[in-house]
């Protein structure tokens, strides 16, 4: 063990024996300050994830909620810095394309993470497409000697979650890692009802992760990666729904389907299936001591199929005078692409990065919509109609960038970059985006940065709305039939921030940011399907400030927390008219615009972890949310108010039992989520943009977990 104090240590030489590996672990009370970055950076280690309540059984969104400016918006979506999703996932530096369900199913389980480096805003030129935040995950890989574990977690909400992982080597040059996890619960999708009773909410999901690394020689390394996620979700329902309050629907349905008898509202049977696969191969090559590059090729398939229960759903139509329908949806997309990253260390003053990425996406969006004809007076009539549409699109995206990190001296760093983005999908668009960042190290304990950059964010091709469906003359006809193509968002981004090492055991960071957009992109849930549809405002603004504190009070006591304030407003509707009601469109087009659905004014989280006698860990977690936007009543302006705030407290205790066999141990954990059983809605369907449904948070829940390490 080598301890480094105030005095520089003498040189250390590590010598590898011919047949044994040396494991080198660098331990610091806190992560060092990033004094050359022009953005807010945050890091999560494997140990920090395992210390959370539920440990590494947490899902992606649960882990993300521990970083600054992260807002939870239901359906496993996390909105960072007041952007709707707009999160870029990377595995070992390679961007992972979104799924058709917009990250509704986790692409990669936190169980496979070794660490995650997070960049919030202030992106250098090599980061594009999704730019609110970048989550760069370094995954586990094989080691010698090999390692593995078998884990079982279960508890409230009919939850059962077995998992298995194993990593090792084959020969001297090939390493591998395998993970499989299966999850079953009755809260796969947040229900519209408060409390423990969940109606029609069962879900199952299976995830597989396979990684292989081949070290050809000292200059060439190859990595293969394969991800698979298969899931089925029942759509939760509410009891006590009023059957055919208008008296018009049931006679029409029974006239179209003689003998039809509607079920109770909680028995309406809608569900969604998801099927996602992703694979890539990366070649990393060291040309010499100053030149490095990586070349990657990737392929992704993603599919989500939503099946409605048309007759029973339509039987509970509240007001046939408003547009109504029930619909099946089938979204399917294939993406292939290549990415090239080049790094050149010109000198101690200049670190140059350049590269390109080419992407091709083919998407299919099939819709089968059920409704009735319009009698000309706004009333349904005739037999039940079945309307079909089959949209097929091919889109291309090209990205190019060059970046110079210029450090003329030890105090100043200038990050100067330029990137170009071109897309061809429903329309052809492009932008050249300068990125300029400056970092100033006042002293080793205090660093300040400023940033300005242009951002270009095209919508996901596979999530564009089904525009070809002809509903004219039916009760599904929208109140506004305007059909503009969604434009790519173009934004000016400003950021200023600072990092402070208060002492060896505490770091503090502050960041303020402002984003001014043309064609501010957004997405919403329209109807009961969890599949989201994109729309855009003519312009928008987002702003906020956040602060984060990390503490290592003793060797066994750590804490971290953050608080953020933010705002998002949209003005004028650019696209998506046929998805919205006339009142919503009028509110958006009003002089003052509207607050965005995903906006949350105040957000905060905190975690305290204490390790007792090396083997027992206690963890407490707090999550505070001031509430997503809604309106007080149907006459109030859209999103003019917010849902009630809520604060969630989670607790965890975990103990490690050593086993008599070499290198083996057993972990036993007990977790409580929502300790004080607060009843709250994550969002409320009424008063916000779209025909959304409410989503209620998890009540007090108990979980047990056991993990055998071998």
Regions found by a protein language model. Give the residues of each.
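Short, acidic, small-residue-rich periplasmic hinge/interaction motif at the N-terminus
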Residues: 3-53, 84-85, 122, 286
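N-terminal periplasmic accessory domains that precede
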Residues: 10-13, 60, 78, 103-106, ...
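Short acidic/polar hinge/loop motifs at secondary-structure boundaries
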Residues: 51, 94-121
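Extracytoplasmic beta-strand/coil segments of soluble accessory domains associated
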Residues: 55-56, 61-96, 114
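Transmembrane beta-barrel wall of Gram-negative outer-membrane proteins
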Residues: 154-184, 195-236, 271-292, 346-347
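Membrane-embedded beta-barrel scaffold of Gram-negative outer-membrane proteins
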Residues: 292-298, 304-306, 441, 449, ...
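Gram-negative outer-membrane beta-barrel transporters
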Residues: 407-409, 512-516, 535-632, 707
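C-terminal beta-signal and adjacent terminal beta-strands/loops
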Residues: 624-631, 655-710
